[in-house]
Amino acid sequence: MPAYDIVVFDLDGTLIDSDDALVRPFLTLGMAQEDITFGHPIEEFCAAVGIDVDEYVRLYDTDVVEPYPGATELIDGLDRWAVCSNKHPESGTAELVRLGWTPEVALFSDAFGGAAKQLAPVLDLVGVEAGRTLFVGDTAHDARCAEVVGCDFAWAAWNPRTAATNPPGTVL
């Protein structure tokens, strides 16, 4: 694998196991388990299913979120790392603080106007070209995000949901 100047991570399903925390508010608000999907901007998904995003965030419990085994050691071993996530900024920031993680930059859904995450603003803030960046994620949305800016992508296969899909390309 080539050397990179920075590694940018998605957060949910990539560095942290947040599936339970993401699902609980939707279930509490009356949504069926089978209708809940991952990888979307939270504002868009809530609007699409008729749930108030503020109510969802109020019910979201950051204390049930845990890093995947080895995630802390992985980021501790990096000189530069950042986060680019569709997560709501309130819960995303709270999780980073609780875990004691301090990425160089952390952009959440509010940075993208509630739309799908974009790597270009992260790269602008860190001053690194796409060709010198690795984006690590767990969904096809993440892979497309990397493709749009032309940076390398790797799948976070330590997430069992991702590993089960046998994703193409670079798998960590």
Task: Describe these PLM feature segments.
Residues D10, T28, V49, L74, ...:
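Short alpha-helical scaffold segments that flank and stabilize functional sites
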Residues P2-E73, R80, H88-E90:
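N-terminal helical cap/lid subdomain that shapes the substrate entry/recognition surface
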Residues F26-L27, E34, E44-F45, I75, ...:
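A sequence-level detector of short, solvent-exposed, charge-rich linear segments
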Residues M1-D5, A82, E90-L172:
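Asp-based, Mg2+/Mn2+-dependent phosphohydrolase catalytic module
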